[in-house]
Amino acid sequence: MSAPFRFPRFFVTSPAPCPYLAGRTERKVFTELSGNNATELNDALGRIGFRRSQSVAYRPSCADCSACVSVRVCASEFAPSNSQKRTLRRNGDLVVTACKPWATEEQYALLRSYLASRHPDGGMADMDEQDFADMVEQTPVDSYMIEYREPVAGGGKGRLVGCCLTDRQGDGLSMIYSFFDAHHPLREGLGTYIIADHVLRAAKAGLPYVYLGYWIEGSARMAYKARFRPLEKLGPDGWSRFEPTPSERIAAMFELA
C-alpha cells in the first residue's frame, strides 16, 4: 500500500537583491521535497514552474515583478538552427555518460574554471567543494551528472569538457545546472551543445520536454534560452508557445551559452 500523499507546506523567503536585474528585489516561495512522494511532488511542481535546488523546490514570488518566465523546449519538434547544427557536428564526437550524482574533484575543477570565466561576480563564485558536493548529491529525485568527455584511443576516460546536473521527470528532463570549458580552442559553443544534446536525447527517449529554468526579460545572461525552438513559456493560463520579439532574438544571438 502506498503512503498517503501529504500536501506540502510552502514558505516565502525575505526580500533580497535580485541577482539578475539591477535595482530589483526577489522573493521565492519554496517547499521541501522529502519522503516517498518526493518524485511525484517534484514532477507536479516542475509542471507549474518550480525548480529544484537540493531537496527544495522553489519558484519566484516577487511582489512587483514578473520578469522570470519558466520555459521548456518541445523535444520532439526541436528544429536546430544552422549554427546549432554546426555546433552539434563540431562536438558530436564527445563521449556522453549519465553518472550517478556523486561530485568529483575533476567536476569541481571544471566548475571553478567556468565560474571564473563566465560568472566571476555571481552568487556561486564562492562555492567551495563541500557546497558543490551538496548541490550534486543532496537529491531526493532521479538525478544524474551528465559528463561530456573528449574521446581517447582505447576507450579510456578522456578530458572532461562539460557537465550538467539533470533530473529526469515524468514529462521530460530538467537541466538543473550546466558548466563547461569556456576557453577550449576547438570546442566553441559547448553550452549550446549540452542543451541541444539534452533535447535530442529527450526526444529519443520519448520525453516531450526539456526544462531550461527561467528566461528573464531584460537579463542578457538568460537571453540564450530563446535560441532553442520551439519553446514554450508558462503564463497565467498555462503553457503556450513563446515567440521572442525581434530585439529578444537579437539579444539571444549574441549571448554566450
From Swiss-Prot:
Transmembrane region(s): none
GO cellular component term of the entry, any: cytoplasm
GO BP of this protein: ubiquitin-dependent protein catabolic process via the N-end rule pathway
Localization of this protein: Cytoplasm
EC number: 2.3.2.29
Single Gene Ontology MF annotation: arginyl-tRNA--protein transferase activity
InterPro entries in UniProt: Acyl_CoA_acyltransferase (IPR016181), Asp_Glu_LeuTrfase (IPR017138), N-end_Aminoacyl_Trfase (IPR030700), N-end_Aminoacyl_Trfase_C (IPR007472), N-end_Aminoacyl_Trfase_N (IPR007471)
UniProt keyword list: Acyltransferase, Cytoplasm, Transferase
One Pfam family per UniProt: ATE_N
Catalytic reactions on record: N-terminal L-glutamyl-[protein] + L-leucyl-tRNA(Leu) = N-terminal L-leucyl-L-glutamyl-[protein] + tRNA(Leu) + H(+); N-terminal L-aspartyl-[protein] + L-leucyl-tRNA(Leu) = N-terminal L-leucyl-L-aspartyl-[protein] + tRNA(Leu) + H(+)
Transferase among keywords: yes
Role played: Functions in the N-end rule pathway of protein degradation where it conjugates Leu from its aminoacyl-tRNA to the N-termini of proteins containing an N-terminal aspartate or glutamate.
Database matches in PANTHER family: ARGININE-TRNA-PROTEIN TRANSFERASE 1 (PTHR21367), ARGINYL-TRNA--PROTEIN TRANSFERASE 1 (PTHR21367:SF1)
Protein family per UniProt: Belongs to the R-transferase family. Bpt subfamily.
Protein name per Swiss-Prot or TrEMBL: Aspartate/glutamate leucyltransferase
Organism expressing this protein natively: Sphingopyxis alaskensis (strain DSM 13593 / LMG 18877 / RB2256)
Chain's gene name: bpt
